[in-house]
Regions:
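Amphipathic, Lys/Arg-enriched alpha-helical "gate/interface" segment within cytosolic domains
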Residues: 2-122
C-alpha cells in the first residue's frame, strides 16, 4: 500500500485521501495510481487538497489538469479538491474551476469539510 494514501469515510461513503502535506501528484500517472488504489478499496471517490498537486496541474498549458479530468470521465471517478487556491493566478484555470463545479465529477472547495460533503453526497 502506498504510504501516502489512506481511506476516509463519511455517511457510510468511503473515499481515498492523502495524509501528506505536500505534492504527491506530480503527473497524470500518479493520479491514475491513486484511482487504482481506490478501486482496490472499492471506492471511486478521491479527496485531495490543493497542495497535493504539483504546480504544473494549475497551468493549463501543461495538459496535466486536462488529463486528470479525462481520467475522471473515463473511469467514472469523482474528485474533490479543497484549498484557498490563492496561488492560482491563471484566469483560465479559475474559469475551469467554475465550470467544473457545475458538473458531478470534480469540485473545488475552500474547506475540506465542504469537499467531503460534496464527495459523499449521492
Amino acid at each position: 500500500m502506498p504510504t501516502e494514501f489512506m481511506m476516509g469515510s463519511c455517511n457510510g461513503a468511503p473515499y481515498v485521501t492523502c495524509m501528506r502535506n505536500e505534492a504527491v501528484i506530480h503527473a497524470p500517472g500518479d493520479f491514475l495510481d491513486m484511482m487504482a488504489w481506490g478501486g482496490e478499496h472499492d471506492t471511486n471517490r478521491i479527496l485531495l487538497r490543493e497542495e497535493h498537486f504539483a504546480p504544473s496541474f494549475y497551468d493549463l498549458k501543461t495538459g496535466f489538469a486536462g488529463e486528470v479530468l479525462q481520467k475522471l470521465s473515463n473511469y467514472g471517478c469523482r474528485l474533490a479538491i479543497a484549498g484557498s487556491f490563492s496561488t492560482v493566478r491563471s484566469e483560465r484555470f479559475r474559469e475551469l474551476m467554475r465550470e467544473a463545479n457545475k458538473g458531478r465529477q470534480i469540485r473545488f472547495t475552500h474547506t475540506e469539510q465542504d469537499a467531503v460533503d460534496w464527495l459523499t453526497s449521492s
